[in-house]
């Protein structure tokens, strides 16, 4: 019998295992996929020019202490997000304009800019206030909330773009309280949106985010991680837990940590069943339509025209793109996010239609026209990832509670049930939705287990 079974080898699960092992506990990690990392997935280019991050990619070593410490510990290399050059806003399919990166689009009137600034500053101020979310804010959608503050049409569109980019949902689909609390966990709205050293999109891993996952797995120990081991049943027998996999293996431990999205608890056979209120809140959580298309080129042709590769779009299918090149290894790419309603439509297309739609939009955004000789039409590799299609993810980034549920079920959401403990970036109060948040939650979940087992001695292996 082990001291602890961890279900899920994403960053929360790996960190939970590491923290528990450091306290002297015996740990086994069970992962349904044939790889570690969860929603972090770095795929090598066939050309040998680095990696494409199909999942989480951005970090900030100064604001995210755990990630920063691990990068130093393992000697991992990072790349700074490229900001130099002009950005582009695509208002409609055939309407685009250029503007200096980091400023409000220049075609807005003074009144429209002031209106956006008012709403932005209000959310920023609310997100910097300590304390729990307000029930009143949890019972209205983000769109209803900003309309109540006097948001104009362009501000409403921009905030909806934020919702799509940040969570893969429309602003009419989740609560204002959840949005504000998410900002609160992540140093405020401005830090989340920032691509410089003040924000969450400052750096990327040179060799892909999975390089950190691999390093963490080495600490856990490969023999302690069982891949391709989907869970069949989880049984809490009061004194210990028994977890059986669909491959016929059975594991026993005094405690079990679930490190999977709460949206997927209902798919597990847990006995006895989770309490009704826990089921009510977790059965209703949703993951956004959060997708990526990564278009790789032989060279960064967009820089020739003074662009930094960043664009945002109301028309889609791509709603935002960034230059994710690693010049050192001759990796030149545009990472395109296809989220929210646009992502739902795009995800229904077959792969070559998805990729064609993205390249067609890139041609319009960068003024390539119908010139088939333009480099935009000549990628060397194209990747796409629809996270809703991924069996053991069902979307990204972090599960979002239903309207009114965040405050109504705060007393049970993410809290231990018997010998079962729950971790994941969704539960973190630091950098929720980011790798740092996953590491934070894993630490806390393991600390719960260590405390609960305190004084009871180690299990006999």
Describe the residue ranges of each PLM region.
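Dinucleotide-binding Rossmann-like beta1-alpha1 core, especially the glycine-rich loop
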Residues: 48-122, 131-132
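Conserved flavin/dinucleotide-binding core of flavoenzymes
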Residues: 23, 240, 259, 289, ...
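Central beta-strand plus flanking loop segment that forms part of the substrate or channel wall
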Residues: 277-305
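N-terminal Rossmann-like FAD-binding beta1-loop-alpha1 element of flavoenzymes
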Residues: 2-29
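Core beta-strand elements of the Rossmann-like FAD/NAD(P) dinucleotide-binding domain
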Residues: 2, 246-255
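Glycine-rich FAD pyrophosphate-binding loop
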Residues: 21-47
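Active-site/ligand-binding neighborhood in enzyme catalytic cores
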Residues: 127-230, 237-240, 259, 269, ...
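Flavin (primarily FAD) binding-site architecture
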Residues: 256-277
